[in-house]
Amino acid sequence: MTQQIDRYAVFGNPIEHSKSPFIHTLFARQTNQPLIYTAETAPKEGFVEAVKAFFAEGGKGCNVTLPFKEEAYQFASRLTERAQLAGAVNTLKKLDDGDIIGDNTDGAGLVQDLLQHQVVLAGARILVIGAGGAARGVLKPLLDQKPTSLTITNRTFSKAEKLAVLFAAYGSVTAKEMNTVTEEYDVIINSTSASLSGELPALSSSIFAANSTSYDMMYGKGDTTFNQWAKQHGAAHAYDGLGMLVGQAAESFMLWRGLRPGSKQILRELRKNLEGL
């Protein structure tokens, strides 16, 4: 009797650049899970139809990336608490009763990566730069680690303020205008995509405390623009978002398959793939 091979995918537009098939294929091999995972381009105006067709044809679960995370949030018939708070969904799973549950594993992936690097979050002073979907998705998991304070700063201050109000019940959260952020922080997280265009947020370089950690959610070959700047101005450690990508994927895999794959070896393989080694 042939073993059934379950289908998973990632939906986005564009999607050619996605590392998710590479990651999940390695996860499947590592855990001996019979599955295939593909990258699927959904039309900008046809995400829901594409995902419905995928599940109707027997798909078990999928990841969702830009620009469809908010649409996936609306599409899901049930939501996890962290997806509700994130206001966006990056993981969908078809349940036995036919319902589709939506989850957001981004924040768990970030925290997992930071802890893997021995970054102490409990009692830390955390600065999050940016107030878009990427920031919103990680705030609750960061606050769950019990930092002393979490400050959100953003070019448009009102967006940072909205997030601070939304998450006030979960810890000490404040919003600050970029030009007023001058104190030192232990963990500085850049959730903006500025590094992709070689730009930097308009922030003072005095934000890096002794032994501080800089974390840029973007990644590429070598240090990102933000991490180069952070190291020049006193950050003791600097990490990019590749580990977060692997961490959120491991969390999605756990939701789908009920077991957590190891991330370290996969991250090494992915880094080699990215550097073209």
UniProtKB/Swiss-Prot annotation:
The active site is at K69. NADP(+) binds at E81, G130, A131, G132, G133, A134, N154, R155, T156, F157, S158, K159, M217, G241. It catalyses: shikimate + NADP(+) = 3-dehydroshikimate + NADPH + H(+). It is an enzyme of class 1 (oxidoreductase). Its EC number is 1.1.1.25. Pathway: Metabolic intermediate biosynthesis; chorismate biosynthesis; chorismate from D-erythrose 4-phosphate and phosphoenolpyruvate: step 4/7. GO terms for molecular function: NADP binding; shikimate 3-dehydrogenase (NADP+) activity. InterPro entries: Aminoacid_DH-like_N_sf (IPR046346), NAD(P)-bd_dom_sf (IPR036291), SDH_C (IPR041121), Shikimate_DH (IPR011342), Shikimate_DH-bd_N (IPR013708), Shikimate_DH_fam (IPR022893), Shikm_DH/Glu-tRNA_Rdtase (IPR006151). The keyword Nucleotide-binding does not apply. Keywords: Amino-acid biosynthesis, Aromatic amino acid biosynthesis, NADP, Oxidoreductase. GO terms for biological process: amino acid biosynthetic process; aromatic amino acid family biosynthetic process; chorismate biosynthetic process; shikimate metabolic process. Shikimate binds at S18, K19, S20, T65, N90, D106, Y219. GO terms for cellular component: cytosol. Involved in the biosynthesis of the chorismate, which leads to the biosynthesis of aromatic amino acids. Catalyzes the reversible NADPH linked reduction of 3-dehydroshikimate (DHSA) to yield shikimate (SA). Homodimer. Belongs to the shikimate dehydrogenase family. This is Shikimate dehydrogenase (NADP(+)). It comes from Vibrio vulnificus (strain CMCP6).
